[in-house]
Amino acid sequence: MVSWMICRLVVLIFGMLYPAYASYKAVKSKNIREYVRWMMYWIVFAIFMAAETFTDIFISWFPFYYEFKMAFVLWLLSPYTKGASLLYRKFVHPSLSRHEKEIDACIVQAKERSYETMLSFGKRSLNIAASAAVQAATKSQGALAGRLRSFSMQDLRSIPDTPVPTYQDPLYLEDQVPRRRPPIGYRPGGLQGSDTEDECWSDNEIVPQPPVRPREKPLGRSQSLRVVKRKPLTREGTSRSLKVRTRKKAMPSDMDS
């Protein structure tokens, strides 16, 4: 476990970070020699990383595996050994130049097939999504229609058959039309004779209605606070005594005459 951690740190620092900074310096200085050197290093290191993916799975149990890997990375990077340039010139460049046309043809075919597969996959995914949306919409519509039908049937069954009772407000009896009793011999829905057609309503046939009370206007705030002044009542005894006195005064005048 310790060797694995040390190996990962060595590969990260000496295999990636330092070569990346050195490549930046080569591009900035426009030194063709350094540029070619670091390009060869990155090609060899990419092949090493691809091979490491499989060797870590199958050969990691081999003793001193991580120590050999650290030593190999340092050998590639060292300016004294120049392991990256040596491997590139001896093995990588000849093999790539030998199979260059085949590699290019495979890349072109892979591009075309990947484009076609992406189009077909996109069409299939769109068709599947559209069919799923249509099925979901139909199912939801059917479920909603069934639910609405069940609710409507329940509502219709819950409506009572009894007529709604009418109520009369005793405060507004004058607004209502007085009802009259039908004449004697009247049959609802039947034909009336010639004698019954000429009959008129009599006064005693009208249903007596209670007397209508005039609506009293509500008192205002100022009127409710006023004090009602009443006139003093005149006594009947005083008026009669005045009449007797006038008669007594009138009698001596008659005697003198």
From Swiss-Prot:
The modification Phosphothreonine is found at residue 196. It is a multi-pass membrane protein. The keyword Membrane applies. One of its GO terms (cellular component) is endoplasmic reticulum. The modification Phosphoserine is found at residues 152, 194, 202, 253. Pfam families: TB2_DP1_HVA22 (PF03134). GO terms for biological process: cell division; mitotic nuclear membrane reassembly; nuclear envelope organization. It is found in: Endoplasmic reticulum membrane. Its main location: endoplasmic reticulum. Residues 177-257 are annotated as: Disordered. It comes from the Eukaryota. The chain crosses the membrane at residues 1-21, 42-62. Keywords: Cell cycle, Cell division, Endoplasmic reticulum, Membrane, Microtubule, Mitosis, Phosphoprotein, Transmembrane, Transmembrane helix. GO terms for molecular function: microtubule binding. InterPro entries: TB2_DP1_HVA22. Belongs to the DP1 family. Microtubule-binding protein required to ensure proper cell division and nuclear envelope reassembly by sequestering the endoplasmic reticulum away from chromosomes during mitosis. Probably acts by clearing the endoplasmic reticulum membrane from metaphase chromosomes. This is Receptor expression-enhancing protein 4. It comes from Mus musculus (Mouse). The gene is Reep4.
